[in-house]
């Protein structure tokens, strides 16, 4: 029965001893200073995962994560963690689109863990994840936030590069997104996709790019009607809001119009703040 389901931590496949694998993890801690600004408190990184804090002319710092391996394939393991202490504010992003390449053996693993202390605000805006034919990937994103914290989260999936004439005939992607507010599970989105889900109208209906925007804040519902009115021609989306949450789901025939549409939504939910420079719109 549906009501007996419980979110489970992602399991990690054993790495194949026959092929070289990419492994990396990066962790950043941001802290609110006495003057009210947010600054780096701790940074640790290893392997192919890197974290950078570019110089920005804005009151809120940006934390940019990078996978120097250039993508994820079977047996790879990539982990990002971003912790905001009480009152801290930051924008998190990835330096470029993440690519999941053809897998010869095993599953590529990606993990993201985000924590928000009391009164903290995090805008987690990674660039799109591009799925390639033959890829096998599992991603798990876990968020732990205080009751009065604010989270803006945008996640985009692209099914092959349309400009390159790519079509996906075989792939496997599993995504598990969990948000706990004050210890209570308030958003859980398990997603399993393969090539059979691309064409049917009851699934993706031929869309080449999909996105989810989640906004969790005490007054999140107030933005619902404004976000609904932003829906552009050529991009299908629906918006719902309840219990301090706003969720938008969007479908488009190509990634570029979807990204431009998302930029308008994020501009509103970020109260006019510019997008991270790495988005390069």
Curated annotation (Swiss-Prot):
Single GO term (MF): nickel cation binding
Disulfide feature: none
Annotated localization: Cytoplasm
One cellular component (GO) term of this entry: cytoplasm
Highest taxon listed in the record's lineage: Bacteria
Keyword DNA repair among record annotations: no
Chain intervals for the UniProt region annotation (Disordered): 1-25
Coarse class of the protein's main subcellular location: cytoplasm
InterPro entries xrefs: UreD (IPR002669)
Name of a matching Pfam family: UreD
Keywords of the record: Chaperone, Cytoplasm, Nickel insertion
Function in brief: Required for maturation of urease via the functional incorporation of the urease nickel metallocenter.
Family membership: Belongs to the UreD family.
HAMAP family found in the cross-reference section: UreD
Assembly description: UreD, UreF and UreG form a complex that acts as a GTP-hydrolysis-dependent molecular chaperone, activating the urease apoprotein by helping to assemble the nickel containing metallocenter of UreC. The UreE protein probably delivers the nickel.
Protein's name in the database: Urease accessory protein UreD
Natural source organism: Dinoroseobacter shibae (strain DSM 16493 / NCIMB 14021 / DFL 12)
Gene behind this protein: ureD
């Amino acid at each position: 029965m549906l009501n007996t389901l419980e979110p489970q931590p992602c399991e990690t496949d054993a790495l194949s001893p026959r092929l070289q694998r990419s492994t990396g993890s990066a962790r950043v801690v941001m802290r609110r200073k006495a003057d009210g600004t947010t600054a780096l408190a701790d940074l640790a990184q290893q392997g192919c995962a890197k974290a950078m804090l570019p110089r920005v002319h804005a009151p809120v710092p940006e934390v940019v994560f990078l996978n120097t391996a250039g993508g994820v394939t079977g047996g790879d393991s990539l982990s990002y963690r971003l912790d905001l202490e009480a009152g801290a504010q930051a924008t998190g992003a990835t330096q470029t689109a993440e690519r999941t390449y053809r897998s010869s053996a095993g599953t590529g693993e990606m993990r993201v863990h985000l924590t928000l202390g009391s009164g903290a605000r995090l805008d987690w805006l990674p660039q799109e994840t591009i799925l390639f034919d033959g890829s096998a990937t599992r991603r798990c994103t876990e968020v732990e936030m205080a009751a009065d914290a604010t989270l803006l989260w945008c996640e985009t999936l692209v099914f092959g590069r349309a400009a390159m004439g790519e079509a996906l005939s075989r792939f496997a992607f599993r995504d598990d997104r969990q948000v706990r507010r004050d210890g209570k599970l308030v958003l859980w989105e398990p997603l399993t996709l393969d090539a059979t889900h691309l064409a049917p109208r009851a699934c993706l209906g031929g869309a080449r790019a999909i996105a989810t925007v989640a906004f969790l804040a005490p007054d999140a519902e107030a933005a619902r009607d404004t976000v609904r009115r932003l829906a552009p021609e050529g991009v299908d989306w629906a918006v719902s809001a309840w219990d301090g949450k706003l969720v938008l789901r969007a479908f488009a025939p190509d990634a570029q119009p979807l990204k431009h549409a998302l930029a308008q939504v994020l501009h509103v939910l970020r109260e006019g703040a510019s997008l991270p420079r790495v988005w390069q719109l």
